[in-house]
């Protein structure tokens, strides 16, 4: 019982700032949310560049060098064409190219088509390797040999 009380005293002592009983408990310091301040700075900078909103954009896809795609569904897009600046607002999701294939084919450029071909070839090779691995699991029996006698 006294062991439990000692543990409680240690825990209580770490939560107090001062030494005495009348001192207030320590308050947890929290990091401020900076996204609102950063967003305001970004909006001010974009306003200086004179961006204009672009309406009726259903989706935005950004192709990465590793073959994945950053997909924005129903984003807000602002653009300043003379400054070659585009701002995309929304929740971006990392997706593989194969997840978006039926609807994304008309958006693919020559580089992306090449990566899609490589992806298809690697997928076919993986299928072949899996079949070969399944066949290699069971060894072939050799006629005339008794493996049980070697174990003993």
UniProtKB/Swiss-Prot annotation:
Keyword Zinc-finger: no
Chain segments carrying region Disordered: 19-39, 125-152
Domain NAC-A/B residue range list: 36-101
Localisation: Cytoplasm; Nucleus
Xref: InterPro entries: BTF3 (IPR039370), NAC_A/B_dom_sf (IPR038187), Nas_poly-pep-assoc_cplx_dom (IPR002715)
Keyword Transport: yes
A GO biological process held by the record: protein transport
Main location as per UniProt: cytoplasm
Bias (Basic residues) ranges: 23-32
Cellular component annotations (GO), alphabetically ordered: cytosol; nascent polypeptide-associated complex; nucleus
Database matches in Pfam families: NAC
Record keywords, A-Z: Cytoplasm, Nucleus, Protein transport, Repressor, Transcription, Transcription regulation, Transport
Domain of life: Eukaryota
Gene3D superfamilies in UniProt: Nascent polypeptide-associated complex domain
Subunit structure: Part of the nascent polypeptide-associated complex (NAC), consisting of npc-1/egd2 and npc-2/egd1. NAC associates with ribosomes via npc-2/egd1.
Stated role: Component of the nascent polypeptide-associated complex (NAC), a dynamic component of the ribosomal exit tunnel, protecting the emerging polypeptides from interaction with other cytoplasmic proteins to ensure appropriate nascent protein targeting. The NAC complex also promotes mitochondrial protein import by enhancing productive ribosome interactions with the outer mitochondrial membrane and blocks the inappropriate interaction of ribosomes translating non-secretory nascent polypeptides with translocation sites in the membrane of the endoplasmic reticulum.
Family membership noted in the UniProt record: Belongs to the NAC-beta family.
Name of protein: Nascent polypeptide-associated complex subunit beta
Organism the protein comes from: Neurospora crassa (strain ATCC 24698 / 74-OR23-1A / CBS 708.71 / DSM 1257 / FGSC 987)
Taxonomic classification: Eukaryota, Fungi, Dikarya, Ascomycota, Pezizomycotina
């Amino acid at each position: 019982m006294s062991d439990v009380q000692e543990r409680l005293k240690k825990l209580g002592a770490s939560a107090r700032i001062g030494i005495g009983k009348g001192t207030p408990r320590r308050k947890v310091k929290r990091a401020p949310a900076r996204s609102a301040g950063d967003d305001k700075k970004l909006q001010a900078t974009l306003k200086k560049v004179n961006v204009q909103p672009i309406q009726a954009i259903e989706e935005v896809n950004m192709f990465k060098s590793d073959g994945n795609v950053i997909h924005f569904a129903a984003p807000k897009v602002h653009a300043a064409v003379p400054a070659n600046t585009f701002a995309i607002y929304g929740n971006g999701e990392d997706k593989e190219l194969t997840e978006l294939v039926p609807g994304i084919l008309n958006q693919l450029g020559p580089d992306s088509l090449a990566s899609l071909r490589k992806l298809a070839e690697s997928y076919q090779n993986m299928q072949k390797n899996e079949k070969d691995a399944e066949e290699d699991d069971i060894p072939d029996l050799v006629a005339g040999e008794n493996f049980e006698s070697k174990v003993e």
